[in-house]
Design a protein with these regions (language model features):
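HIT superfamily nucleotide-processing domains
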Residues: 1-362
Length: 362
């Protein structure tokens, strides 16, 4: 099964998941063609395997009608020429090793504390971010310097619990800012300015950050129109077409509308806290690592830590993880299409989903 077969796969589903797929997704396939001059043929064959591979290209477009997130899939994009230094994996390992004894390795003297102090977990301790982008903006510094060290469900759970305690302390200080957001930018390619393993946390007021609030409103609109839960239907579709699996109650799937390469989504049950998806996050992280991903972004969406008068009843805790590419690659993975139109994706979600069944090094 591949993404180019998506339309026929949906058409063959049982009535309930097929109806959900048709409610949520708009799927279309188009063909791109070109005429290659004879002078280019040797280069094309070397780069793409054959001239036929580029002469006629199938592009699959998937749009989530509810959230208006969308992706354009063409696996040929993965073979396009880019400036990638050799041995970038070895260079990453050397960079991690050479940055030991950085300020995060001495948290007490190398980082500031928040005005409520530090929160300590078994595997990490919090600090206050020096250059903030919200009133409370903290860092969860891992005890282990290497951000690529294996991380099982227990380790994920410990980090999530420590970060949550930080957020609760922040909300006690600033009750008007109950919206908690957690992120993990792993390595410089993914936006991490410090190599040492760390997550970041913020709390904000007024409403949740726009992308979280937009998702909440979209799900409510879907429920009002169809009398169905958007997140349950989203899972129903992905599971039915073979893109998802469950682990310890968490629903993990390779999304049909990834923001960028190899995006995995982890859904909890409504009312559950983030600890309930620790095993799912560990599975997703291990799946990415099993296919060589080292630079990734992770975001945690959840309801506010105090009632705000809005309807969050059916909003589940969820995590999104995405591959940001080879740290040694000088070509940026984000361009004008991703910023202003739709994501252009080279990785097939069905291939990504297979990695969920054979992750290593979690």
């Amino acid at each position: 099964m591949s993404i180019v077969e998506l339309e026929s796969r949906i058409a063959a589903l049982a009535p309930e998941p097929r109806a959900a797929a048709e409610r949520i997704f708009a799927v279309s396939t188009t063909t791109g063609t070109l005429v290659a001059p004879a002078e280019m043929r040797p280069w094309i064959e070397k780069q793409f395997g054959s001239v036929d591979a580029v002469t006629s290209q199938r592009i699959v477009r998937v749009t989530d009608r509810v959230t208006l997130e969308g992706a354009l899939f063409n696996d040929l994009r993965a073979k396009r020429p880019m400036s990638v230094p050799e041995k970038s994996g070895a260079e990453v390992a050397e960079t991690i090793r050479s940055t030991e004894n950085d300020p995060f390795c001495s948290v007490a003297t190398g980082t500031p504390a928040d005005d409520f102090g530090r929160i300590r977990g078994a595997l990490g301790v919090t600090a206050s971010n020096v250059a903030k982008y919200d009133g409370y903006h903290g860092v969860l510094v891992f005890n282990t310097h290497d951000p690529l060290a294996p991380m099982d469900a227990a380790a994920i759970a410990d980090h999530l619990a420590t970060a949550r305690k930080w957020a609760e302390a922040a909300v006690l200080r600033a009750p008007a800012a109950p919206y908690y957001f957690l992120m993990w930018n792993c390595l410089w390619r993914a936006g991490g300015s410090i190599v040492h393993g760390h997550m970041q946390m913020t709390t904000t007021g007024g409403m949740h950050y726009p992308k979280v609030e937009r998702l909440r409103r979209a799900a409510l609109a879907y429920a009002a129109e169809h009398r169905r839960d958007y997140f349950d239907d989203l899972w129903l579709v992905h599971e039915a077409i073979g893109l998802g699996m469950t682990v310890a109650g968490a629903r993990v799937f390779a999304t049909l509308t990834p923001v960028k390469e190899r995006e995995l989504v982890v859904l909890g049950a409504p009312g559950a806290d983030e600890g309930a998806i620790a095993a799912g996050i560990s599975l997703a992280l291990g799946a990415l690592r099993s296919v060589g991903v080292v630079a990734h972004d992770l975001a945690l969406y959840r309801s506010p830590l105090a009632a705000d008068g809005a309807d969050w009843e059916r909003f589940p805790v969820l995590a999104r993880l995405v591959d940001r590419g080879d740290p040694g690659n000088r070509t940026c993975d984000i361009g004008s299409m991703e910023l202003y139109a739709a994501s252009v994706i080279a990785s097939d979600p069905f291939v990504v989903a297979r990695s969920l069944h054979q992750p290593v090094g979690r």
